[in-house]
Amino acid sequence: MKASFWHEKWKKREIGFHESVVNPALTDHWHALSAAGGSVFVPLCGKSLDLGWLLSQGVSVIGVELSEIAVQELFVSLDIEPSVSDVENFKLYSAENIAIWVGDIFNLNKAWLGVITAIYDRAALVALPESMRLEYAGKLIELSNCATQLLVTFEYDQSLHQGPPFSVPESAVQKCYGTRYQLQCLERKAVAGGLKGRIAATESVWKLSRNINS
């Protein structure tokens, strides 16, 4: 899946993936991350309202997003005037306790981010086709040194919808993270009204904790 796919989505305002409320998976299971006073990394963050909620919890937020349109709209929604700078092939939008990198997550440099206490992945893993997931998971592990994750996935009959969001069953989560993390399913429930309003689907919320030996 090319970056141009997501740039086009934002240009055409085809952003049904953007939620108009803070995601309940975050508010209900935030405590599982034990990230109070730390920094939370949000991959493929878009202009999610979840970022403002995280800031309200007193943590620093670090995000990465391909679309500069999304990042500009994020700061408008937060009513924050960011400082904008160029860092190699990224643009960095930053303000007190928040730093959003505009560019390809696969090119992000660990040294730029500092210590990551936890990861919140609501919309990143499910946005990637199977062929990209292992590389993505490896990048998160590299950037965060296996920081604890709160991960949201969907499972449904992939033949009914080409994605994104893609179906990511438990076996796929295990394949991506099972060797480095202990996986705990915190919640599993049917998607109310179905995925895209028509496809029976299950939403799962996972806590990923670093294996002692990883």
UniProtKB/Swiss-Prot annotation:
Subcellular location: Cytoplasm
Superkingdom of the organism of origin: Bacteria
Residues that coordinate or bind S-adenosyl-L-methionine: W10, L44, E65, R122
Residues making up the signal peptide according to the UniProt record: none
Record InterPro entries: SAM-dependent_MTases_sf, Thiopur_S-MeTfrase_Se/Te_detox, Thiopurine_S-MeTrfase, TPMT
Annotated catalysed reactions: S-adenosyl-L-methionine + a thiopurine = S-adenosyl-L-homocysteine + a thiopurine S-methylether
Keyword entries, A-Z: Cytoplasm, Methyltransferase, S-adenosyl-L-methionine, Transferase
EC number: 2.1.1.67
PROSITE patterns attached to this UniProt entry: SAM_MT_TPMT
Keyword S-adenosyl-L-methionine: yes
Main localization, broad class: cytoplasm
A GO molecular function held by the record: thiopurine S-methyltransferase activity
One GO term (biological process): methylation
GO cellular component: a single term: cytoplasm
Membership in a protein family: Belongs to the class I-like SAM-binding methyltransferase superfamily. TPMT family.
Entries under NCBIfam families matching the protein: PRK13255.1, TMPT_Se_Te
Protein name per its UniProtKB record: Thiopurine S-methyltransferase
